[in-house]
């Protein structure tokens, strides 16, 4: 089960939109079930829960990742955090769309990206001065547990909003809780580790930044 951490309320930004009562109940139920089924522990390494705007970026191995990471956050942060999720999966049926809306997911179409409809610009427009994000820079899932190369989206988020704290996250064993191709999760123990925030450094190239960001996630695996 996730540990309880005090939350720093370091921001006085506007309040988030209030979800309907049924979606709030479903969202709370999802969080409880995710904790029970994955049995995850949460570690904050040189980092503490905070209501400031952040981008949590993590390795990606399972459809459960977005829900798992969102559920691992304290309740005060969940209402301020929007997971970015694949529209081709979470938008496939009315039931999945409803579930996604209950944890305020932002659905991105990975296969129909247009120049004038940048996913990064959409994310920044949707979060405004209110929400944090959960993203998976690899773009797709890697079921073998090995991290792929990071896509450029994280770099452009950091470049366009340098005020956002970029929090590396390593999710261990969630790919075995909901293996690729499976519908029902398998109860197992897993661990979610949050690391120290990083920022885009002055003069840092896209390639160097993405390599450094990926390495910060990888190091959490061994911490």
Regions found by a protein language model. Name each.
Residues 48-112:
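Catalytic core of membrane glycerolipid acyltransferases/transacylases, capturing the structured
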Residues 22-23, 29-60:
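Helix-to-loop junction immediately C-terminal to a conserved catalytic motif
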Residues 1-10:
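Soluble, non-transmembrane catalytic domains of enzymes that act on hydrophobic metabolites at membranes
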Residues 195-197, 212-221:
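A conserved mid-domain beta-alpha-beta active-site/ligand-binding segment of alpha/beta enzyme cores
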Residues 126-155:
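Catalytic-site beta-strand/loop segments enriched in glycine and acidic/polar residues
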Residues 53-55, 130-136, 165-167:
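Residue-level preference for the first positions of well-ordered beta-strands
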Residues 144-207:
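A cross-family acyltransferase "interaction/gating" segment
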Residues 104-129:
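Helix-adjacent hinge/juxtasegments
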């Amino acid at each position: 089960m996730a540990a309880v951490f005090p939350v720093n309320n370091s921001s006085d930004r506007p309040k988030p939109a209030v979800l309907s009562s049924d979606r709030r109940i479903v969202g709370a139920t999802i969080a409880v079930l995710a904790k029970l089924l994955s049995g995850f522990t949460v570690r904050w390494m040189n980092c503490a829960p905070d209501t400031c705007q952040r981008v949590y970026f993590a390795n990606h191995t399972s459809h459960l990742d977005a829900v798992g990471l969102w559920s691992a956050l304290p309740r005060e942060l969940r209402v301020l955090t929007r997971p970015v999720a694949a529209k081709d999966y979470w938008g496939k049926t009315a039931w999945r769309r409803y579930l996604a809306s209950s944890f305020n997911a932002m659905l991105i179409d990975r296969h129909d990206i247009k120049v004038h409809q940048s996913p990064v610009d959409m994310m920044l427009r949707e979060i405004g001065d209110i929400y944090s994000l959960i993203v998976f820079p690899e773009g797709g899932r890697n079921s073998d547990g090995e991290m792929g190369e990071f896509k450029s989206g994280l770099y452009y988020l950091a470049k366009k909003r340098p005020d956002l704290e970029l929090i590396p996250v390593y999710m261990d064993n969630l790919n075995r809780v909901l293996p690729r191709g499976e519908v029902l999760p398998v109860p197992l123990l897993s661990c979610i580790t949050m690391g120290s925030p990083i920022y885009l450094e002055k003069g840092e190239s896209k390639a160097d930044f993405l390599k450094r960001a990926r390495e910060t996630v990888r190091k959490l695996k061994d911490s």
